[in-house]
C-alpha cells in the first residue's frame, strides 16, 4: 500500500474518535501519526505542513485568504490551526489532534490545492478526429515512397539508410509497447505507478544482449570467407556482379512487352532490394524505364503472393489505425507517440511491400495502387479506434497493439535487420559501421518515446 494511503487511513481512524474519550484504537492510531510526523507526541504547524505535503494536499503557492469555508478552498497548515483556534506556535497533542483530522481528510479527498490546469483533460471531438486523420494521412504517404525511392535502391549508400530506418522502427515500436501501450492496457500511470524505470530496464536487458551478441560476432568472425547461410543474396548496388538475374516476362499490353527484373527472394521470405528494375521491349528495341506498362497485366495473371501481401498489409494497417484512434482518445501525446512509432515502422515495410508486388508481376502503377489501398484500411481502423475509445475502455486495443508491436519489432524486423547484411558485410570495419548505424537507429527511437513518456504531462499541444 502507498504511504499516503496508509497515513490517510490512520487519519480516518483517528478522526472516528472525535467526541469520544481518547482511548482504545483511536488513541493508538493518533499516537502513530504524531510519532512519525511530530516530536514528543505533539505536532507543530510546520510538522503539519510536512504531513500535508506527504499526503499531496499541501498548497502549491502561498496561503489564500480565508473567507467562507467551502469544499474547494485550499488551506495551509497555518489556516487549519487558525480555523480551530490554535496559534501557529501551538503544539497539537493526541487530545486535540482528532479535531483537525476532518480538515486534513477534506483537503486530501477534494485536492483543492492542485492546479486545475494540470489535470489531464481528454482531447475534444474535433481534436481527436483532426489529429488522428492527419497522422494516418502522413503515415499512408509512406506507401507512396516506393516510387520515389526505387531509383535509390542501387546506390551504394542505400543499405546504410535502410539499416538506420529499420533500427529506428525497432526502437520506436518496442519502446512504444513497453512505455505506452502495455502500461495503458493495465491502467498504469507513469507519474503514480513509477513503471518507467522498470520499462527502461526491460529495454536495457534486450539492448545489452543485442550489444554483447553483435560484439562477440564481430570479434570472433573470420571475414573473407563464405558464411554458412541458408540463402544467397546479391550485394546492394554491387558493381562487381558477374551477371544480372534473368528477367521475368510479363504479359504484353497494348503491343508493349514488359520484363521485370525481380528482387531476390530468399527461401525464408526475405526480400533484398538490389535488382529491382523494369525494362520494356517494343519493336525489338530495348528501352530501360520504370515501367512503360502503365495498365499492367491482368489481375488474374498476378502472383498469389501479391494478394497475400496486400490482404495481410491491410489487416496490419487496420490494427495500426485502431491503436492510433484509441491513443488519441486518451491524450494527444499518447496518440502522437503511437503515430511516430507506426510511421517509423511503415517506412521500411511499405518499401518492402512495393518491391514484393513488383516481383509478383504487377506494374509500377498497380503496385502503387494496391499498396495505397491496403494502407487506406488504416482510416477504417482509426474510426473504429476512436468510437471504441470514446464509448468503451480502450485497454483491450492497447493490449492488442502492444503485443503486435512487440512481435513486429522483435520477431519480424530485428531478424530482418541482421539478415539483410549477411553478404554486404565483407570486413570488420564495414561490420562495425553497420553495427553503429543499427545502434543509432534503435537508440534514437528509444530516446524519442522515453522523452514523450517522461514529459507528457509537461507538453501541451494547442
Swiss-Prot record:
Catalyzed reaction equations: Zn(2+)(out) + 2 hydrogencarbonate(out) = Zn(2+)(in) + 2 hydrogencarbonate(in); selenite(out) + Zn(2+)(out) + hydrogencarbonate(out) = selenite(in) + Zn(2+)(in) + hydrogencarbonate(in); Mn(2+)(out) + 2 hydrogencarbonate(out) = Mn(2+)(in) + 2 hydrogencarbonate(in); Fe(2+)(out) + 2 hydrogencarbonate(out) = Fe(2+)(in) + 2 hydrogencarbonate(in)
Gene Ontology annotations of biological process type: arginine metabolic process; bicarbonate transport; cadmium ion transmembrane transport; cartilage homeostasis; cellular detoxification of cadmium ion; cobalt ion transport; DNA-templated transcription; extracellular matrix organization
Keyword DNA-binding: no
Subunit comment: Homodimer.
UniProt family annotation: Belongs to the ZIP transporter (TC 2.A.5) family.
Matching InterPro entries: ZIP (IPR003689), ZIP_Transporter (IPR050799)
Originating organism: Rattus norvegicus (Rat)
Compartment(s) of residence: Cell membrane; Lysosome membrane; Apical cell membrane; Basolateral cell membrane
Name assigned to this protein: Metal cation symporter ZIP8
Gene Ontology CC terms: apical plasma membrane; basolateral plasma membrane; lysosomal membrane; organelle membrane; plasma membrane
Cytoplasmic topological intervals: 154-160, 213-367, 412-431
Transmembrane segments: 133-153, 161-181, 192-212, 368-388, 391-411, 432-452
Main localization (coarse): membrane
Post-translational modification: N-glycosylated. N-glycosylation is not required for proper iron and zinc transport.
Signal peptide limits: 1-19
Function comment: Electroneutral divalent metal cation:bicarbonate symporter of the plasma membrane mediating the cellular uptake of zinc and manganese, two divalent metal cations important for development, tissue homeostasis and immunity. Transports an electroneutral complex composed of a divalent metal cation and two bicarbonate anions or alternatively a bicarbonate and a selenite anion. Thereby, it also contributes to the cellular uptake of selenium, an essential trace metal and micronutrient. Also imports cadmium a non-essential metal which is cytotoxic and carcinogenic.
Motif XEXPHE-motif, chain ranges: 345-350
